[in-house]
Amino acid sequence: MRTLRVGIASYEQMKARTLAIARGNYKPAAGEPKVWFTSAESFARVLSDRNRALLGIIAESGPESLARLAELTGRKKSNLSRTLKTMERYGFVQLSRGVRGSIIPRVPYQNISLTLPLSKPRLPGTEAA
């Protein structure tokens, strides 16, 4: 079962971690988050109950177009397009072109695991703040 690991960290922490990785000073471990949000609130907005339900419908029904997904969900194509593009930026969904330019959504993970620090997080590869 594929699980996407998500973490919460400040912009400054994410930047420092990325630079440490780019310089070769830090190599992320296999179990570390692959996707980062700057707050639990931003994570909750992207993966709201409605959007998690949308991911479930995509995973279960495998719609071959946004038009079909709109039929299954009762949502407008324009709304779906915006939502899916946002989720694609975070890796929650993959969008590919089908026949005649249709957009085919796919969910590459069965689970999403959130690492939520209870104290000020210190990312591996960053200096102590």
Q: For each predicted feature, which ranges?
A:
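Short, cationic-aromatic polyanion-contact patches
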Residues: 44-48, 65, 95-121
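Basic amphipathic alpha-helical segments that dock to polyanions
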Residues: 58, 69, 84-90
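Amphipathic alpha-helical dimerization/coiled-coil segments
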Residues: 9-11, 17-31, 112-129
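Short amphipathic alpha-helical interface segments
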Residues: 50-63
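Short acidic, hydrophobic short linear motifs in intrinsically disordered regions
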Residues: 63-71
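Short alpha-helical segments that sit at the start of domains
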Residues: 26-53
